[in-house]
Curated annotation (Swiss-Prot):
Active site: 24 (proton acceptor), 101 (proton donor)
Gene: aroQ
Protein name, per record: 3-dehydroquinate dehydratase
CDD domains named among the record's database cross-references: DHQase_II (cd00466)
Keywords tagged on the record: Amino-acid biosynthesis, Aromatic amino acid biosynthesis, Lyase
SUPFAM superfamilies the UniProt entry points to: Type II 3-dehydroquinate dehydratase (SSF52304)
Residues reported in the UniProt entry to bind substrate: 75, 81, 88, 102-103, 112
Amino acid sequence: MTQTIFVLNGPNLNMLGKREPGIYGGKTLKDIEADCKVAGRELGFDIDFRQSNHEGTLVDWFHEADEKAVGVAFNAGAYTHTSVALHDAIRAISIPVVELHISNVHAREEFRHKSMIAPACKGVICGFGPHSYILALHALKNITA
């Protein structure tokens, strides 16, 4: 039976390809989903790829992932810097979570330098463009093997 990885995406990531391509590149979230599914197959994972602009939905998906998946790759978007609820949802589950970002958040505005969720995650990957997602999948393969 193939193991499942949830790839969860937070607010405004549905706008990739349109929103600030100089920062986030030209790939859409659908493009990234397709890349993740290919990489997932190569790594032996089924990829459950989701996006929501709503914090509570993301919390619910973490609870669901704990029952159905072996790990989560998570791009929280702006919730990275504000959400105690997502921090607590990650702490509440038993599977590893890798925080990821397309841009290097540490090379951007000061308010983006602090992650509320990083202390609850197994690790953080940022700054490698859409390839950050693939790196997160490789990290999860390594820590769930």
